[in-house]
Amino acid sequence: MPMAQMTQNPVFVAIDTTVVGDATTLAARLHDEVGGIKLGLEFFARNGHKGVKEVCRAGALPLFLDLKFHDIPNTVAGAVRAVMPLAPALLNVHACGGRAMMIAAREAAQSEALALGIAPPKMIAVTVLTSMDDDDLGGTGVAGGVLDQVRRLAALTRDAGLDGVVCSAREARVLRADLGDDFLLVTPGVRPLWSTTNDQKRVVTPQEAMAEGADVLVIGRPITGATDPAQAARLIAGEIVGWDVGI
């Protein structure tokens, strides 16, 4: 699967704080326990490039820059070029922005990475937010339910030449069958059995997510909200691979 080319640990920890000091502390503590870090829109809006660079220096881990770009193609291409100096390993857009927008994002990432002499990011698209269920989606005017929409948008993403999608692990098995082993599946909404579900409705455990075909697991509060984040990350690793992590 594509994940093996990035890191042996499939867990990217979602550092969902706007405080740079807290984020850098978490990144440093988790350096040996996770495969990467995810920074999102709220952190980026508050702290910009400087804050992202500080966290990346502290953690020395691959970066998933979760900004979910969604605008006209030229604007998205410009936004992608603007964040490329941060050298993200993963960068995402909204699939519902359409094929032309996704192509523009991919081409901008590739050309700017070449100009900067860095590896281009894996470009992925958001299908349906994991906070949404069938009723929520129907309220936006989309018929057919979450899975139908996820499959449509994932196919569109592949046709635009992107590397994969963000999806719930509950859709991963179907998407793996639809789109093959070389299509990256990044799954938020993953919670170990000992954690609460918080605000995400389509939730599975880490072990279940991997069994369903996920490549990257995005896990936030079960790790970052724990008394000992490093221990929590090790417990999750133990759930995934079924080994005794010595805790």
UniProtKB/Swiss-Prot annotation:
<protein>
    <recommendedName>
        <fullName>Orotidine 5'-phosphate decarboxylase</fullName>
        <ecNumber>4.1.1.23</ecNumber>
    </recommendedName>
</protein>
<dbReference type="InterPro" id="IPR001754">
    <property type="entry name" value="OMPdeCOase_dom"/>
</dbReference>
<keyword id="KW-0210">Decarboxylase</keyword>
<feature type="binding site">
    <location>
        <position position="191"/>
    </location>
    <ligand>
        <name>substrate</name>
    </ligand>
</feature>
<feature type="binding site">
    <location>
        <position position="130"/>
    </location>
    <ligand>
        <name>substrate</name>
    </ligand>
</feature>
<comment type="pathway">
    <text>Pyrimidine metabolism; UMP biosynthesis via de novo pathway; UMP from orotate: step 2/2.</text>
</comment>
<feature type="active site" description="Proton donor">
    <location>
        <position position="68"/>
    </location>
</feature>
<dbReference type="InterPro" id="IPR011060">
    <property type="entry name" value="RibuloseP-bd_barrel"/>
</dbReference>
<comment type="subunit">
    <text>Homodimer.</text>
</comment>
<dbReference type="GO" id="GO:0004590">
    <property type="term" value="F:orotidine-5'-phosphate decarboxylase activity"/>
</dbReference>
<dbReference type="InterPro" id="IPR018089">
    <property type="entry name" value="OMPdecase_AS"/>
</dbReference>
<keyword id="KW-0456">Lyase</keyword>
<comment type="function">
    <text>Catalyzes the decarboxylation of orotidine 5'-monophosphate (OMP) to uridine 5'-monophosphate (UMP).</text>
</comment>
<dbReference type="InterPro" id="IPR047596">
    <property type="entry name" value="OMPdecase_bac"/>
</dbReference>
<dbReference type="InterPro" id="IPR014732">
    <property type="entry name" value="OMPdecase"/>
</dbReference>
<feature type="binding site">
    <location>
        <begin position="66"/>
        <end position="75"/>
    </location>
    <ligand>
        <name>substrate</name>
    </ligand>
</feature>
<dbReference type="InterPro" id="IPR013785">
    <property type="entry name" value="Aldolase_TIM"/>
</dbReference>
<feature type="binding site">
    <location>
        <position position="38"/>
    </location>
    <ligand>
        <name>substrate</name>
    </ligand>
</feature>
<dbReference type="Pfam" id="PF00215">
    <property type="entry name" value="OMPdecase"/>
</dbReference>
<feature type="binding site">
    <location>
        <position position="200"/>
    </location>
    <ligand>
        <name>substrate</name>
    </ligand>
</feature>
<dbReference type="GO" id="GO:0044205">
    <property type="term" value="P:'de novo' UMP biosynthetic process"/>
</dbReference>
<feature type="binding site">
    <location>
        <position position="221"/>
    </location>
    <ligand>
        <name>substrate</name>
    </ligand>
</feature>
<keyword id="KW-0665">Pyrimidine biosynthesis</keyword>
<feature type="binding site">
    <location>
        <position position="220"/>
    </location>
    <ligand>
        <name>substrate</name>
    </ligand>
</feature>
<dbReference type="GO" id="GO:0006207">
    <property type="term" value="P:'de novo' pyrimidine nucleobase biosynthetic process"/>
</dbReference>
<comment type="similarity">
    <text>Belongs to the OMP decarboxylase family. Type 1 subfamily.</text>
</comment>
<dbReference type="GO" id="GO:0005829">
    <property type="term" value="C:cytosol"/>
</dbReference>
<feature type="binding site">
    <location>
        <position position="16"/>
    </location>
    <ligand>
        <name>substrate</name>
    </ligand>
</feature>
